Amino acid sequence: MGSVTGAVLKTLLLLSTQNWNRVEAGNSYDCDDPLVSALPQASFSSSSELSSSHGPGFARLNRRDGAGGWSPLVSNKYQWLQIDLGERMEVTAVATQGGYGSSNWVTSYLLMFSDSGWNWKQYRQEDSIWGFSGNANADSVVYYRLQPSIKARFLRFIPLEWNPKGRIGMRIEVFGCAYRSEVVDLDGKSSLLYRFDQKSLSPIKDIISLKFKTMQSDGILLHREGPNGDHITLQLRRARLFLLINSGEAKLPSTSTLVNLTLGSLLDDQHWHSVLIQRLGKQVNFTVDEHRHHFHARGEFNLMNLDYEISFGGIPAPGKSVSFPHRNFHGCLENLYYNGVDIIDLAKQQKPQIIAMGNVSFSCSQPQSMPVTFLSSRSYLALPDFSGEEEVSATFQFRTWNKAGLLLFSELQLISGGILLFLSDGKLKSNLYQPGKLPSDITAGVELNDGQWHSVSLSAKKNHLSVAVDGQMASAAPLLGPEQIYSGGTYYFGGCPDKSFGSKCKSPLGGFQGCMRLISISGKVVDLISVQQGSLGNFSDLQIDSCGISDRCLPNYCEHGGECSQSWSTFHCNCTNTGYRGATCHNSIYEQSCEAYKHRGNTSGFYYIDSDGSGPLEPFLLYCNMTETAWTIIQHNGSDLTRVRNTNPENPYAGFFEYVASMEQLQATINRAEHCEQEFTYYCKKSRLVNKQDGTPLSWWVGRTNETQTYWGGSSPDLQKCTCGLEGNCIDSQYYCNCDADRNEWTNDTGLLAYKEHLPVTKIVITDTGRLHSEAAYKLGPLLCQGDRSFWNSASFDTEASYLHFPTFHGELSADVSFFFKTTASSGVFLENLGIADFIRIELRSPTVVTFSFDVGNGPFEISVQSPTHFNDNQWHHVRVERNMKEASLQVDQLTPKTQPAPADGHVLLQLNSQLFVGGTATRQRGFLGCIRSLQLNGMTLDLEERAQVTPEVQPGCRGHCSSYGKLCRNGGKCRERPIGFFCDCTFSAYTGPFCSNEISAYFGSGSSVIYNFQENYLLSKNSSSHAASFHGDMKLSREMIKFSFRTTRTPSLLLFVSSFYKEYLSVIIAKNGSLQIRYKLNKYQEPDVVNFDFKNMADGQLHHIMINREEGVVFIEIDDNRRRQVHLSSGTEFSAVKSLVLGRILEHSDVDQDTALAGAQGFTGCLSAVQLSHVAPLKAALHPSHPDPVTVTGHVTESSCMAQPGTDATSRERTHSFADHSGTIDDREPLANAIKSDSAVIGGLIAVVIFILLCITAIAVRIYQQKRLYKRSEAKRSENVDSAEAVLKSELNIQNAVNENQKEYFF
């Protein structure tokens, strides 16, 4: 019910916001009157005019008066045409023409607006586009609707480009309507206090709207408080708006009672900014200009105890709850409404509800501060000083985002040298230099590139130099030498002119980009209007009477928590520690599933998973168990066995499960998986799951759908049964669950919950443990998921005219597309989506070129990646494209990515409206022939297979994965196709695992052996295709490949022995002196050929690798990858009737040479690994039998790892992956080696033996102990009390169930 109420409130908020926006913007159908045509001639002005007949008064649209339009005297970017609308109006559209019947027209222009005729502001589209496209001829009309509209009195058109064969020429019209404005001017000491009737106040709803403008960066706009510390405050701080809400005791702040929201930036620009605050219950909208923040307040927000008064512009009395520093607002407020009440109108009428404190006026004063914008690093302002005083002094204010740049340079008169004032790393530095003398430096301020206004004062007099920043005097420095300093030189602000002008100006760190104002030289304020008109000083690339700074980090286009920083012309994203990369932190560095990690060749371990790729969900850590199928294992906090007593329907027990991921992350992971399951075990003693009399559930569980579920493990939602009920083997056939038999003894119902739409389990409720001797216990396993529906989702396109279509792709500001393809065609379009003018297209342009082309309004761009090899090789290739605010990029496979920077201040919105075509185009031409797989757009997978099933000439699925992924199968493993994906067949490999990369090793104790009998194998497999059948006695073996590794310290030792029925043999031994010997006897009438490697002691306890490759009489031998030898046999070229292969001790050793016999009698003690003779792997056959292999094992042979160092347990280096406990350090990309070492296993084993010997317990007790030991190892962090309780319960369960066949043994 709460969620429904929240949704309703949110909808009402949205509707009220839309209504407010309509009021703010005006009704577009009623606000489109022409505003220029009826204006008097005096309303038009310009920078200059070519002649009296080209004056600004002739610039009316469609008029032919005079010369047919306005043209300036000189065509350059400093010209402008200005319109005075007489009063503030709402302007909703503009239209332009060129000069009538001429070659004079403007092709692009800026539109600026102002209330006072100075301090102009540029109008921007899409929050970044400053320029309007103009005309292509003299007479056609180009019309633009302004969204949002402009509220201003003055408009100024500034031509940027014009017809290169003519000059600037303009005729214009603007459209709009009258604008209602009620204003109040507050001087920084005054405020308004509104007291309202309690009856008129809604307890759950508040709407406050206003506009403000100011030159101050700090001030209180509104404040309302209560007696207990509750308050709502809207405060301007550092030119940003903060909404502060405290809904609890101010002395005890907490995250549930404090709200601190920030919106807006650079709000002290003396231009109007709109604010809207809407509260409906706990739903709050906070809007500043076009930026909106919606949030759901926590705590008792809708029950705030506030007084029945609200102040605007300040806090009139000492606040009972305000502990933060604050000052009153200095500026103007407009159209101030509180819950529909016009506050300014009430104040004008001097109504008793309004108390005006201080000097309050109802007209807005216009401070005549004229800023100047330095647009580029080439900008400068050169001003003369004619005062001739014995002092060099200047003051000014500046604001910028750049860390470095020249602020001021002045030459010294009568003596050579100069004074430099510049920014370096955000600090202000002053430098006075004279030739032949060391410079005198002063450093002041920090982080002065924060976009705020900063004041600077410079003074150099006699032998003293001082600098002040924001009123703080920096350390003064004595000047070098007794020379007197005189003013009268030229002051260069912001940069230096070209050297061709003969200037001595120096700019060590480049020019300044930013704004300056209030410039004074020798105590006299500089008249910038005179500068603009050319009568004072000189300048280049300036915008006078306007500050064009903008905050490129608002809104923050850095995604996924990336930190935004900026300079004058661009922004940068720091993606450190976000888990994402790219220009805007859009691309996840993690895979989306364990399946994807597996097909990169990764082994079992911990990995970060990003289920929705570049989508909003954060990555999270889980465990991937890489078996033949990749299993995703997600843990929760309820893995302990939990006992429950003393519950009933009136007093139920509820257990909650919290997972390592959020519910949204879990849902994305589950939806992506092919299959998910959770094992649930319910132990019971007189505790039922269902009341048989009325069918009422006595226990139930809840999943992610928040619905009650009464089916149990092994069953499905439509059958309220347990596993035994489905299998028909419950302990009481009258019931469908063991626990429903209600017996006074422990039993259980265990099974898998596998209906993934209901998973994971989030809650368990138990109500039937309140009777005598009644008790229950439960244990929930981790969430296990396998497969990836998206990774293999694919479609095959049969003709060039075939395609799949999907809804329009929405990636206005940030878009990424990724997919796999394979083809034999030389070209074809993978994907295309069109708009009215915008589009994106990805295609195979030629066999070696993939191209990404797009247009977002700045003209078409293309990015191509060329490969040295062909893409149409029928192998899978991966394509990823991205387009964002900063750049577009294309990467194919592992080739170097290609990028295309976005144009500065260009169009940014990708606006598409057609269907998305996959595998073809709307024209049904240049379609793609081949397969496309795993197509994702902004992290969301398109279901190609589902759409292909209903589309002609397109087939669901693709085959031929082994051509691309076969290389993942190692050590002789063979890639086999599956309907979805592939697998590695390790049948004829000495290795195992999903990629045949896990070596099979064994520790051989003294006197032990493994014997593989080929003749018996032939009898078993002569009708099969087994490669072992090739060793039949009737066959002659002219070649073999032998590989293995070993570690030992014993001599002599027999490593490997192969014999035949004709007394031929091959032996690999370590002689008494530690040398390795390989003996071939391929003719029973000759002595064996002996190859001796005596370069080192091979029984040194280190791991050694042996490879023997025989081709008839030539044998190639390699030892440890660095010792190689080739020998020619004299005893024969064929191995006839192979009998057996022996590892370790030879039980029958007649007819062999003495050294082999001695080594064979001794056998082998140590570790052997990955033993393979051609396609026979004897250790694998012995330790991992898949069918009745003819293998005999004698003595102590145990699976181990040869990677262990001497003196340690042979298994201590093995990776152990337990579902219940995965601990250790975490690497972002590679698996985590488990910290559970086998030392504990060895100790546990010894303890088990001691207990067995001392107590002589039964086999059942041994199993109980093993369960307890394994459980203890997997749950090492559990408290002793929990361990004890579980051990007792397990003992009860196992002793009782030793005679109960229905008891399921469950442990990891």
UniProtKB/Swiss-Prot annotation:
Q: Which family does it belong to?
A: Belongs to the neurexin family.
Provide the primary localization: membrane
Supply the Gene3D superfamilies for this chain. Answer: 2.60.120.1000, 2.60.120.200, Galactose-binding domain-like, Laminin
Q: Which InterPro entries match?
A: ConA-like_dom_sf, EGF-like_dom, FA58C, Fibrinogen-like_C, Fibrinogen_a/b/g_C_dom, Galactose-bd-like_sf, Laminin_G, Neurexin-related_CASP
Q: What spans does the record annotate as topological domain Cytoplasmic, numbered to this chain?
A: 1263-1308
Q: Which species? A: Homo sapiens
- Quote the SMART domains the UniProt record gives: EGF, FA58C, LamG
**Name of a matching Pfam family:** Laminin_G_2
**What is the name of the protein in this document?**
Contactin-associated protein-like 4
Q: A single GO BP annotation from the record? A: regulation of synaptic transmission, GABAergic
> Which residue ranges does the entry give as Extracellular-facing topology?
26-1241
